[in-house]
UniProtKB/Swiss-Prot annotation:
Source organism superkingdom: Bacteria
Role this protein plays: Probable regulatory protein for the mepABC organic solvent and antibiotic efflux pump operon. May function as a repressor.
Keywords, comma-separated and alphabetical: DNA-binding, Repressor, Transcription, Transcription regulation
Protein name as it appears in the record: Probable HTH-type transcriptional regulator MepR
Signal sequence segment: none
Amino acid sequence: MVRRTKEEAQETPAQIIEAAERAFYKRGVARTTLADIAELAGVTRGAIYWHFNNKAELVQALLDSLHETHDHLARASESEDELDPLGCMRKLLLQVFNELVLDARTRRINEILHHKCEFTDDMCEIRQQRQSAVLDCHKGITLALANAVRRGQLPGELDVERAAVAMFAYVDGLIGRWLLLPDSVDLLGDVEKWVDTGLDMLRLSPALRK
């Protein structure tokens, strides 16, 4: 029995993450147990604990997987050495929206994060995790906007803190709206218009000036 447990503990984390994704998507994060995930993955709960301490770490793994494909663009826009930070942000947003529509796994994970991750009393750790992720994203957007101001791509009097909040709210809200009512928004066909709407807000809105 001990030998079997050790063998199962060597199961790849990717297999467990894939099972967690399916379980969370079907049942929601709060209603899914590690036993549910273990059954789908074909392993014991002990094998899950070998790689992940709890559901919060599995949710974080799903969130991290969303960032892998466009992390280089985010880092470029945040770098003071980047000559076209706003251009990098535009490419990043185009990639985010295109992947959301065209990649089924990306869509499922976003569906989990937006509509199937309930912040109940026993989900405090996941709530704190999401708060941390939002603050990290805010920091990255702020750096990118500050770089764009320095490069003359955005107004010098732009309030980058307020603008970062507005940009996050715009993108996150558009994603949430499309996931809820995909037929009401042509996110793929009008992707450049949707991205440029957000960027024009940064360039032109008097309410975002200091």
